[in-house]
Amino acid sequence: MASSLIAKRFLSSSLLSRSLLRPAASASHRSFDTNAMRQYDNRADDHSTDIDRHSERSFPSTARRDDIFLRCVGSIFSDSEFEPGSEHDGPGHGQSVPLRVARDRSWRWSGRGWDARETEDALHLRVDMPGLAKEDVKISVEQNTLIIKGEGAKEGDEEESARRYTSRIDLPDKLYKIDQIRAEMKNGVLKVVVPKMKEEERKDVISVKVE
């Protein structure tokens, strides 16, 4: 009985690992200037919640949508801290994390050094990048994957002393306007706004006239 349970858990873990990993593609690549953002809502939210930095990376189909969003956001930035002499590649060292959000409610989740908030109009991300300037930050989208990279100047002669940051966020297809992403880098804080498509703008539902 015990050996059967172990085998099932191993198989499930392997399938999940393979489903999260996919090769990065150069096609459909978009880059965004960190000067492009014009506005950002900084209003406080009484429902801000700290996320467990060791959040699960599995997303069972039976889970509630708010639970899924909680785990996703917690995983996205779980390893994203700045420490000279180390490089952080986000969850799983290069793995992409699917971002699944509920469309009928607004959310805000935060942790040390980051904040993610969803409204009816957009997804708002704030990431602390102390020591980096806007020239050190690169934001791009490759096949619906939002990629945030930051690398500062070396401190001294050692190459490992440079501050580095990398995170990948898979955005649901046909839900966000990836060509209208806005970003602003100011005083070591990166703010990114990803506008959402309105229901009438989405083309995934086609009505067929019956004659």
From Swiss-Prot:
Indicate the residues annotated as transit peptide.
1-31
Membrane spanning segments where? Answer: none
Source taxon at top rank: Eukaryota
Keyword presence, Lipid metabolism: no
InterPro entries this protein is in? A-crystallin/Hsp20_dom (IPR002068), HSP14.7/HSP23.5/HSP23.6-like (IPR044656), HSP20-like_chaperone (IPR008978)
The family note in this entry says: Belongs to the small heat shock protein (HSP20) family.
Q: What is this protein called?
A: Heat shock 22 kDa protein, mitochondrial
Q: Which organism is it from?
A: Glycine max (Soybean)
